[in-house]
Swiss-Prot record:
One of its GO terms (molecular function) is magnesium ion binding. The gene is dxs. The keyword Cytoplasm does not apply. Mg(2+) binds at D146, N175. Pathway: Metabolic intermediate biosynthesis; 1-deoxy-D-xylulose 5-phosphate biosynthesis; 1-deoxy-D-xylulose 5-phosphate from D-glyceraldehyde 3-phosphate and pyruvate: step 1/1. Catalyzes the acyloin condensation reaction between C atoms 2 and 3 of pyruvate and glyceraldehyde 3-phosphate to yield 1-deoxy-D-xylulose-5-phosphate (DXP). It comes from Clostridium perfringens (strain ATCC 13124 / DSM 756 / JCM 1290 / NCIMB 6125 / NCTC 8237 / Type A). InterPro entries: Dxylulose-5-P_synthase, THDP-binding, Transketo_C/PFOR_II, Transketolase-like_Pyr-bd, Transketolase_BS, Transketolase_C, Transketolase_CS. CDD domains: TPP_DXS, TPP_PYR_DXS_TK_like. One of its GO terms (biological process) is isopentenyl diphosphate biosynthetic process, methylerythritol 4-phosphate pathway. Its EC number is 2.2.1.7. This is 1-deoxy-D-xylulose-5-phosphate synthase.
Amino acid sequence: MSEVLQRITDPKEIKDLDEKELEILAEDLREFLIESVSNTGGHFASNLGVIDLTVALFKNFDFSEDRIIWDVGHQSYAYKILTGRKDKFNTLRQYGGLCGFPKRTESEYDFFATGHSSTSLSSAAGMARAQRLLGKDNKVIAVIGDGALTGGMALEALNDIGYRKDNLIIILNDNQMSICKNVGGLATYLNKLRMGVGYNKLKSDIGSTLDTTSFGKRVKNSLSKLKDGIKKIVVPSMYFEDIGLKYFGIVDGHNIRELNEVLSIAKNIKGPVIIHTVTKKGKGYELAEKNPNKYHGVSPFDLGEGVISKFASRNYSSTFGEEMIKLAKNDDKVVAITAAMPDGTGLKEFREEFPDRFFDVGIAEQHAVTLAAGMAAEGLKPFFAVYSTFLQRAYDQVLHDVCIQKLPVTLCLDRAGLVGEDGETHQGIFDISFLSPMPNMTIVAPKCIDEMEVILKWASNFNAPLAIRYPRGGDIDVNLKPLSKIEYGKWEKVQEGDKIAIVATGKMVQHAMIAAQKIKEEKNIDILIINATFIKPIDKELLNSLSKDGFKIVTIEDNIKKGGFGEGVLEYLNEIGHKEKIVTLAFNDKFIEHGKPDILYKINGLDAEGIKNTLIELL
């Protein structure tokens, strides 16, 4: 590493660097990021792709005054390094360390927290309007990827920004990827724009030539009357300018000179500007350039060997994908939907085997849910695979388009519960609370991977709205047998016991088993453990029996306490006049920060030791 990055103590110092030094700084950042993220894990390829752009932004703007919002935020690592967080980068995504996304409480340079996609344009427009109303003239910049631009919220914002003529700069970071390959009409449009780069160069070259003589200037003035028509022919649609944005492109996102030129022009233009840059995910690390999807998010890895795929252990996502293929082979009405996450949700092989029955709608969860509702209305059996945290974006569609009509749409909620290192914006700890109040909604959870297969088979013949929630990763080493069949609304006694009954949901049954074993070893007392396969409806018959037999009851869930499973059980037990103690173990009313799940469970009293301590207090 050269001395350029080492000597930067204030981001304002970057303004004083010449072009050669800026290029060296970019290489220093690449070298530092490759070394650091290979040790900590994190978002890898996307960050390598925006380093040159980040350097150019610091050259042209003062972020002690100007504002920048990184859409999604996973590509903000170089920005974090240059804003005083380099020495803490070895704590990235660790509990108590740096967050992997922008976070207002982490730095004065993080102006708006992000994590979910397609929010940057709306927040940037809000900041720009606030600047105007407050009499300020600071620049506002939003950096958004071509994948995030497929999100409906981003398109809504573009429409409003073009109409209101907000004074902001939008940088379209076009790497032709979100996590996986982009899909949809906008992706096709952007590809046509890339192909039309010759038009932009031709226009520039001809203009420069004509400007050299007075006759040429008159010719240029006459030809300008044909400009709009020529654009329509050579560059398809000119969508951005049609809705009121000044378009600059296409710019090489790895050419600092080009970036400086266009940014220096854009910052002096009033009204909305969009700069279309083309970048390469993984730039500077050959293996990531060749396979950016594999290197999107990585665990720690050896730089010489690269990321090694893990095939040894089963996980819920891959099992879901395998079972979906089995269902589709036996039932031609089964279809799969995802919102730009075919790999993460385990549907990659399904897509290859059943391309006509697989629908990747892009980053469009609202559309995905109502698309599924339409399919269900016509007799298909749609399964929408989505991370729990992203289903939050489609609350109204689930309620209005699925539940009111009681349509048989199956919501497969991957990453339910703690996801760990991605932190507050990605923890899947709210789905029980926002789905439970919906009439006609049923919620189930497998206690182990093998039970996932049983539930999915049952779900394919369930004729009403259904949510299946399951965690990231695999099982703990606990010996659990799956249910042989599903009986609607009924729970399962996993282990017999006296005095205390644990009623746990999903993977928390495994935590309960370990805690109960500790109690057996220390106190020689057997704890009754119940697998609440159905989170909604609750098994009132079994609860009546527990109450009649005088059990103290502990509910355990990896969801927030408010509106959760435990509160539903507590409400019913109070209704029937249960006399014994009731304890609900869940996450309290707070957001759960980033860190390894084991640490986060422990801190929140939901690991086996914490559960054991709760049980001891009840004995």
